[in-house]
């Protein structure tokens, strides 16, 4: 059963992590306690031999051996190896979950496009869902131990109602050296085709929609099989597991508290390997994460709930195509038809802090408040005669003002005294655009460009 902890960490608090640390099921403690107990027992055994059995001369040799091994513990690149290993395993895990197969899309398209209240139409809709789910059952029982225990044989699949006796007879007629996962999908597609021929589907496009949903479902299950058939190369998890276990096996000797150490002459004899125990929890726990995600079809606490998904898909699919078919509510005006929409909250939540408006981080910045006129020119001054320029009259308090659009710099100087402005009415707080046109008087006097340049 998947361990759910989302409610415990719904809100971040300084003590939130305690809700996870003191859990047992699915925790790091339940994953490493056996290895840690064995390692700690061996550590104290070696420590007792050093303290109470070895002679003084033998202790000196032991100290030199401890120094030699401890100085070379960094030769094993655990951080690098575990980091790449966990990253690769985690990507496989989430991809498998994405394609594991939820039947909702097939059910919704089937209920929408296969029309009719007759028993025949209802049989079409229900059997399409059942055939798709039958394939998922056949695949899961070959991948997941939980599903295998539930359906040890095909007879148990038929007894559970996923396959009718005559369907199992047709299934057994095909003698094939490989898996027959394709057969229920063929039945489902054939039903879609027959429903179109009988007029239960109104157009070929709707046949394509239903067929595409079935195809996506089938493709996802095919990739699930591919990932099970071709796992990560065995040398990869082997070398990572070997590195972690060998590191701490050598650490039984290297992390002993000894007297007269040349590497750490000021070593405090704590008897208990406190810092090494912390390191053991982190590294061994990290390795257990990878081992748990390497094959999510087992019976670990966080493995996929295949039986739950099978039950959920069949129940949800049949409910959608049966009770959910053609049950549209009566069409009426909504509550905001004649009124402005105002967000409503419960009285308890209405006093909470307002949520952040999704705007740009600089949307509230107003540039050009102290400038009365802004001249927009091309970066290349040699093109001033052929490129349109703009002069913006900044309105007080708005940050953006009237935009004057001469056709060119020469036209601006020629027609500045004989042009008029065309005003576009805007709402309060917005800006107006004034365009200079040749031969028209202007209401807003504009200084010639040469005077503006002299002022600069």
UniProtKB/Swiss-Prot annotation:
What high-level taxonomic lineage is stated for the organism?
Answer: Eukaryota, Metazoa, Ecdysozoa, Nematoda, Chromadorea
Tell me what topology the record assigns in the membrane.
Multi-pass membrane protein
Q: Does the keyword Cell membrane apply?
A: yes
Q: How is the quaternary structure described? A: Forms oligomers.
Provide the protein name: Bestrophin homolog 18
| Function recorded in the entry | Forms chloride channels.
Q: List GO molecular-function terms, semicolon-separated.
A: chloride channel activity
* Entry's localization field: Cell membrane
What Pfam families does its record include? Answer: Bestrophin
Similarity comment: Belongs to the anion channel-forming bestrophin (TC 1.A.46) family. Calcium-sensitive chloride channel subfamily.
InterPro entries found in the cross-reference section: Bestrophin, Bestrophin-like
**One Gene Ontology cellular component annotation?**
plasma membrane
Q: Which superkingdom heads the taxonomic lineage of this protein's source?
A: Eukaryota
Where is it chiefly localized? membrane
* Parts of the chain that traverse the membrane: 29-49, 83-103, 234-254, 267-287
Where do the record's region annotations for Disordered lie?
416-456
Q: Which UniProt keywords apply?
A: Cell membrane, Chloride, Chloride channel, Ion channel, Ion transport, Membrane, Transmembrane, Transmembrane helix, Transport
């Amino acid at each position: 059963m998947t361990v759910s902890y989302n409610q415990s960490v719904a809100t971040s608090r300084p003590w939130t992590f305690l809700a996870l640390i003191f859990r047992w099921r699915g925790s790091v403690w339940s994953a490493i306690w056996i290895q840690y107990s064995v390692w700690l027992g061996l550590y104290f055994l070696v420590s007792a031999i050093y303290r109470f059995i070895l002679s003084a001369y033998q202790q000196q040799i032991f100290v030199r051996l401890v120094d030699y091994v401890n100085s070379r513990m960094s030769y094993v690149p655990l951080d690098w190896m575990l980091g790449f290993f966990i990253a690769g395993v985690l990507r496989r895990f989430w991809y498998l979950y994405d394609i594991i197969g939820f039947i909702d899309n097939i059910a919704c398209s089937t209920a929408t496009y296969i029309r009719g209240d007759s028993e025949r139409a209802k049989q079409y809709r229900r059997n399409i869902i059942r055939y798709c789910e039958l394939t998922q059952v056949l695949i899961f029982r070959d991948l997941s131990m939980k599903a295998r225990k539930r359906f040890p044989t095909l007879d148990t699949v038929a007894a559970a109602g996923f396959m009718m006796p005559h369907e199992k007879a047709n299934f057994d007629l095909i003698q094939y050296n490989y898996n027959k996962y394709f057969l229920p999908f063929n039945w489902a597609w054939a039903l879609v085709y027959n429903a179109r021929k009988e007029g239960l589907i109104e157009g070929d496009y709707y046949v394509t929609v239903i067929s595409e949903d079935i195809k996506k479902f089938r493709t996802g299950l095919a990739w699930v099989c591919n990932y099970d058939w071709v796992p990560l190369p065995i040398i990869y998890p082997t070398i990572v597991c070997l590195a972690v276990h060998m590191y701490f096996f050598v650490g039984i000797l290297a992390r002993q508290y000894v007297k007269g150490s040349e590497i750490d002459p000021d070593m405090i004899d704590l008897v208990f390997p406190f810092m090494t125990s912390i390191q053991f929890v982190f590294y061994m726990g990290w390795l257990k994460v990878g081992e748990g995600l390497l094959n999510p079809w087992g019976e670990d606490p966080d493995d996929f709930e295949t039986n739950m998904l099978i039950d959920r898909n069949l129940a949800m699919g049949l409910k959608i195509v049966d009770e959910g078919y053609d049950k549209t509510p009566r069409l009426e005006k909504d509550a905001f038809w004649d009124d402005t929409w105002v967000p409503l909250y419960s009285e308890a939540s209405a006093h909470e802090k307002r949520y952040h408006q999704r705007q740009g981080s600089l949307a509230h910045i107003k540039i050009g408040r102290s400038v009365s006129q802004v001249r927009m020119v091309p970066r290349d001054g040699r093109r001033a005669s052929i490129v349109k320029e703009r002069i913006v009259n900044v309105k007080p308090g708005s940050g953006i003002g009237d935009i004057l659009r001469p056709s060119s710099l020469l036209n601006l100087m020629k027609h500045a005294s004989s042009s008029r402005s065309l005003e576009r009415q805007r709402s309060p707080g917005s800006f107006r655009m004034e365009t200079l046109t040749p031969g028209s008087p202007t209401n807003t006097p504009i200084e010639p460009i040469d005077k503006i340049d002299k002022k600069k």
